[in-house]
C-alpha cells in the first residue's frame, strides 16, 4: 500500500515546483534515519541503493524493510535501483518487487545507450516500473565505477529530446557539472544548459552528485526543472565521521545500540537539510 513507484512522486514534484530527494542507504540504521526524518517532516523521499548496496544487504531484505517501515510510519516510500547497468540484474530485482529503476548506460555511445535503455524500459513498463536513464556522464566514483574528470561529458540538449523519445523513459538524469563524491571547491553548474534541456524535454529531470552543493545551487536547479536530487556521499561522510568521533572519545564502547546513535543523529541533520533544500516538506 505504501511502497510506490517514483513516477507519480516525480510528476507531482514537476507540477508542484519542488524536488524529491533520493537518499542512498546501506543498512537498517541508515534507512531508519531517512524514513523517520521523512515521516516527521511529511516529505516524499526515495530509498536508493546501488548494486553494491543490494548485494550487501540483500534485495529481499531491503524490500521487506521498506515495506515494513512504510506501513509503520503510514508514509509512502519508493525503493529505487541506483546506477544499475545489467539487464538480468534489473529484471531479477523487478520480479522481486522493486518498482523504480535507473539503468545507467551513459558510458556507451549514444546509439548503444538508447538501445540498452529501451530494452530495460520495454521490460520494466510491463510491470508498471518507472525507469530513469542518464545522458552525459558525471565524473567521480559511484560504487566500484570510477570516471575520470577528463572522461566526463555534459548532456547535449538536442540529443536529450531524441534520447527521451526513442527510449520511452520516465525521467532523465542530466550532466551539468556535478560529480559523484564531495567537492574540493564549489562546482560551476551549467544552468543555461539545464534551462535548454528543460525546453527540449518535458520529463522530470534528475540531478546526481548533489552531495555538498549549496542550497542556492540546489534551489536554482529545481527552478530549472530538476525534480529528483540524489545524495549519497554526504550521508556516508556524516555517519562515518560521527561514528569515528564517538569511538575515539569512548574507546570502551562495545554496544552498537549506543555508539550508532551519534552517527544516526549526524546523518539525520543532513537528511533534514536536503529535504528543506528540495522544498518537499509537507508534500507527502
From Swiss-Prot:
<dbReference type="GO" id="GO:0008270">
    <property type="term" value="F:zinc ion binding"/>
</dbReference>
<comment type="pathway">
    <text>Carbohydrate metabolism; D-tagatose 6-phosphate degradation; D-glyceraldehyde 3-phosphate and glycerone phosphate from D-tagatose 6-phosphate: step 2/2.</text>
</comment>
<keyword id="KW-0479">Metal-binding</keyword>
<comment type="similarity">
    <text>Belongs to the class II fructose-bisphosphate aldolase family. TagBP aldolase GatY subfamily.</text>
</comment>
<keyword id="KW-0456">Lyase</keyword>
<comment type="function">
    <text>Catalytic subunit of the tagatose-1,6-bisphosphate aldolase GatYZ, which catalyzes the reversible aldol condensation of dihydroxyacetone phosphate (DHAP or glycerone-phosphate) with glyceraldehyde 3-phosphate (G3P) to produce tagatose 1,6-bisphosphate (TBP). Requires GatZ subunit for full activity and stability. Is involved in the catabolism of galactitol.</text>
</comment>
<dbReference type="GO" id="GO:0019404">
    <property type="term" value="P:galactitol catabolic process"/>
</dbReference>
<protein>
    <recommendedName>
        <fullName>D-tagatose-1,6-bisphosphate aldolase subunit GatY</fullName>
        <ecNumber>4.1.2.40</ecNumber>
    </recommendedName>
</protein>
<dbReference type="InterPro" id="IPR013785">
    <property type="entry name" value="Aldolase_TIM"/>
</dbReference>
<feature type="binding site">
    <location>
        <position position="181"/>
    </location>
    <ligand>
        <name>dihydroxyacetone phosphate</name>
    </ligand>
</feature>
<feature type="binding site">
    <location>
        <position position="208"/>
    </location>
    <ligand>
        <name>Zn(2+)</name>
    </ligand>
</feature>
<dbReference type="GO" id="GO:0009025">
    <property type="term" value="F:tagatose-bisphosphate aldolase activity"/>
</dbReference>
<dbReference type="GO" id="GO:2001059">
    <property type="term" value="P:D-tagatose 6-phosphate catabolic process"/>
</dbReference>
<dbReference type="InterPro" id="IPR050246">
    <property type="entry name" value="Class_II_FBP_aldolase"/>
</dbReference>
<comment type="subunit">
    <text>Forms a complex with GatZ.</text>
</comment>
<dbReference type="InterPro" id="IPR000771">
    <property type="entry name" value="FBA_II"/>
</dbReference>
<feature type="binding site">
    <location>
        <begin position="230"/>
        <end position="233"/>
    </location>
    <ligand>
        <name>dihydroxyacetone phosphate</name>
    </ligand>
</feature>
<dbReference type="GO" id="GO:0005829">
    <property type="term" value="C:cytosol"/>
</dbReference>
<dbReference type="Pfam" id="PF01116">
    <property type="entry name" value="F_bP_aldolase"/>
</dbReference>
<keyword id="KW-0298">Galactitol metabolism</keyword>
<dbReference type="InterPro" id="IPR023955">
    <property type="entry name" value="TagBP_aldolase_GatY"/>
</dbReference>
<feature type="active site" description="Proton donor">
    <location>
        <position position="82"/>
    </location>
</feature>
<feature type="binding site">
    <location>
        <begin position="209"/>
        <end position="211"/>
    </location>
    <ligand>
        <name>dihydroxyacetone phosphate</name>
    </ligand>
</feature>
<feature type="binding site">
    <location>
        <position position="180"/>
    </location>
    <ligand>
        <name>Zn(2+)</name>
    </ligand>
</feature>
<feature type="binding site">
    <location>
        <position position="83"/>
    </location>
    <ligand>
        <name>Zn(2+)</name>
    </ligand>
</feature>
<keyword id="KW-0862">Zinc</keyword>
<dbReference type="InterPro" id="IPR011288">
    <property type="entry name" value="TagBP_ald_KbaY/GatY"/>
</dbReference>
Amino acid at each position: 500500500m505504501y511502497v510506490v513507484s517514483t513516477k507519480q512522486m516525480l510528476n507531482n514534484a514537476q507540477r508542484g515546483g519542488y524536488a524529491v530527494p533520493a537518499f542512498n542507504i546501506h543498512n537498517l540504521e541508515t534507512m531508519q534515519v531517512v524514513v523517520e526524518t521523512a515521516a516527521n517532516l511529511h516529505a516524499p523521499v526515495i530509498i536508493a541503493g546501488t548494486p553494491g548496496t543490494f548485494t550487501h544487504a540483500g534485495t529481499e531484505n531491503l524490500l521487506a524493510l521498506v515495506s515494513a517501515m512504510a506501513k509503520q510510519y503510514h508514509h509512502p516510500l519508493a525503493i529505487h535501483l541506483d546506477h544499475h547497468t545489467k539487464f538480468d540484474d534489473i529484471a531479477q530485482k523487478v520480479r522481486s518487487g522493486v518498482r523504480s529503476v535507473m539503468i545507467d548506460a551513459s558510458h556507451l555511445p549514444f546509439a548503444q545507450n538508447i538501445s540498452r535503455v529501451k530494452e530495460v524500459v520495454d521490460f520494466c513498463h510491463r510491470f508498471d516500473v518507472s525507469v530513469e536513464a542518464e545522458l552525459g556522464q558525471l565524473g567521480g566514483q559511484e560504487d566500484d565505477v570510477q570516471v575520470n574528470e577528463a572522461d566526463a561529458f555534459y548532456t547535449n540538449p538536442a540529443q536529450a529530446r531524441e534520447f527521451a523519445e526513442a527510449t520511452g523513459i520516465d525521467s532523465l538524469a542530466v550532466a551539468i557539472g556535478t560529480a559523484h563524491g564531495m567537492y574540493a571547491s564549489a562546482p560551476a553548474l551549467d544552468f543555461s544548459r539545464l534551462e535548454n534541456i528543460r525546453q527540449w524535454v518535458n520529463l522530470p529531470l534528475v540531478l546526481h552528485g548533489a552531495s555538498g552543493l549549496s542550497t542556492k545551487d540546489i534551489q536554482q536547479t529545481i527552478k530549472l526543472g530538476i525534480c529528483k536530487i540524489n545524495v549519497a556521499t554526504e550521508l556516508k561522510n556524516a555517519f562515518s565521521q560521527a561514528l569515528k568521533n564517538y569511538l575515539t572519545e569512548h574507546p570502551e564502547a562495545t554496544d552498537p545500540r549506543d555508539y550508532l546513535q551519534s552517527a544516526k543523529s549526524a546523518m539525520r541533520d543532513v537528511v533534514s537539510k536536503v529535504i528543506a533544500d528540495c522544498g518537499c516538506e509537507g508534500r507527502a
